[in-house]
Each structure stands twice: as structure tokens, then as C-alpha cells.
Amino acid sequence: MRIEKCYFCSGPIYPGHGMMFVRNDCKVFRFCKSKCHKNFKKKRNPRKVRWTKAFRKAAGKELTVDNSFEFEKRRNEPVKYQRELWNKTIDAMKRVEEIKQKRQAKFIMNRLKKNKELQKVQDVKEVKQNIHLIRAPLAGKGKQLEDKMVQKLQEDVDMEDVS
């Protein structure tokens, strides 16, 4: 069973699903749903349509360069069936999928970390600009009042010592 890729959105196309468009020069385009086919007919660029894999990779939102993608390459050479080879291949596929998921999760966390740092810098900048909105007008008065009280007490103590 061969799972094809959609020409427009790079989504998986399972056997018996999707549609195929064959151009006059025998170039085959496969589409997973009518939405992709319509966008292709409108000559839209997949890298500019925000919901496609091509956009996400071009914008740096998804992992693009990784060794684990080498395993997804299409191989058209028929190989003689051997049960051992088949079992090893399936085990390797599972392992590769685990590794790929870990790397993608790490990539996403790094992306989010950068955004958090930028957000902190913006928050600090905004607070500094609008500090007058945060500070109450009488916020410093309490300390001044306390200082005056201390001075009066000291003066009273000094006056008693003199008398």
C-alpha cells in the first residue's frame, strides 16, 4: 500500500481517496481534497497559503532539515520479500517516528521559548513607558509622612534632653 502526498498541502493520500490531475506533458498532480484542487486551479502558491505544510516550513514554523526525513524518500526498486528484513524495517520505522516526534517537540519548545523572551522584553518596555498609570499619586507620601514623624520624635527627644 503506497501512501501518496498531496501536491498542494503535502497531506497524506490513502489508496482510493483524493483525485489525480494529469497534465498534457504527463505530469501527475495528486490532491487530497477538493480544497487543494481548487487552490491549484486558481494557481495559488502553496508557500503563501497559511494552512499548507509548505508555508509552515518556509516560515520556520516546522522542522525542515533533519536526517529523519531521509527515511521517507520514495524507493522504486523492488526488494525480495524476507520476513526478517520486513520485521527489522517495521521496528526501524517505529524508532524513526519516535525520534522525529522528539525532535519536532524540541523544535517547537525552542520556538515558543524565543517568543516568551520577546514577550518579557515587551512587557518590561510597556511598564517603563506607562509607569505613571501604575504608581498611585500618594504612593511615595507614606514614606515621607513616616520620615516626618521620625524627625518630630527626634526633635521632641532632643528638647527633653536640653531641658
UniProtKB/Swiss-Prot annotation:
- Specify whether Nucleus is a keyword of the entry: yes
Compartments annotated for it: namely:
Nucleus, Nucleolus
Where the protein is mainly located, per its record?
nucleus
Task: Return the Gene3D superfamilies for the record.
Answer: Ribosomal protein L24e (2.30.170.20)
Record bears the keyword Cell wall biogenesis/degradation: no
Q: What keyword terms does UniProt attach to this protein? A: Nucleus, Ribosome biogenesis
- UniProt xrefs under InterPro entries: L24e/L24_sf, Ribosomal_eL24, Ribosomal_eL24-rel_arc, Ribosomal_eL24-rel_N, Ribosomal_eL24_CS, TRASH_dom
Entries under CDD domains matching the protein? Ribosomal_L24e_L24
What family name appears in the similarity comment? Belongs to the eukaryotic ribosomal protein eL24 family.
Give the function comment from the record: Involved in the biogenesis of the 60S ribosomal subunit. Ensures the docking of GTPBP4/NOG1 to pre-60S particles.
Q: State the name under which the record lists this protein.
A: Probable ribosome biogenesis protein RLP24
Q: What is the lineage of its organism?
A: Eukaryota, Metazoa, Chordata, Craniata, Vertebrata
Gene of origin? RSL24D1
